Amino acid sequence: MMWWAVWCAAMVAGSVFTAAAPPTDSIDLMQMDPSLADDESLGFAMQSLSGRYAAAPWLYLLADVSHDPQNGSDRVKRRMPSLSIDMPMSVLRQKLSLENERKLQSLRAMANRNFLNDIGKRGFHWAPSAKAAKFY
């Protein structure tokens, strides 16, 4: 609890030596004037503050400064052409995979066809075909 009291005392002592307002020349914004209250968010505060702080040279109104985060800076972003080969390689891999699957399926179908042709025939087709044995 003692540290809290020491901290409060340090804050009070430090606030005595701080400046009450920034110097007039350090901020280059428009001074507060009742005729400039165009911002809807500051309109309710202007009437009560204008008579009280109008003579204070350090109080400024930020109504003319844009509050829109979409506005951004005036810097134009250069759009460089994208030279990524990720998507074309992905497409080629997919097509290669489909082609390999198609070939494998046709070879399996041919092996099945040869196997079914060899069933029940005891003549010169007695040995299973070489192609069918290769793919199982």
Swiss-Prot record:
InterPro entries: Corticotropin-releasing_fac_CS (IPR018446), CRF (IPR000187). Residues 27-76, 123-136 form a propeptide. This is Diuretic hormone 41. It comes from Bombyx mori. One of its GO terms (biological process) is body fluid secretion. The keyword Transcription does not apply. GO terms for cellular component: extracellular region. Its main location: secreted. Keywords: Amidation, Cleavage on pair of basic residues, Hormone, Secreted, Signal. The modification Isoleucine amide is found at I119. It is found in: Secreted. Residues 1-26 form the signal peptide. It holds the Pfam family CRF. GO terms for molecular function: diuretic hormone activity. Belongs to the sauvagine/corticotropin-releasing factor/urotensin I family. Regulation of fluid secretion. Transmembrane segments: none annotated.
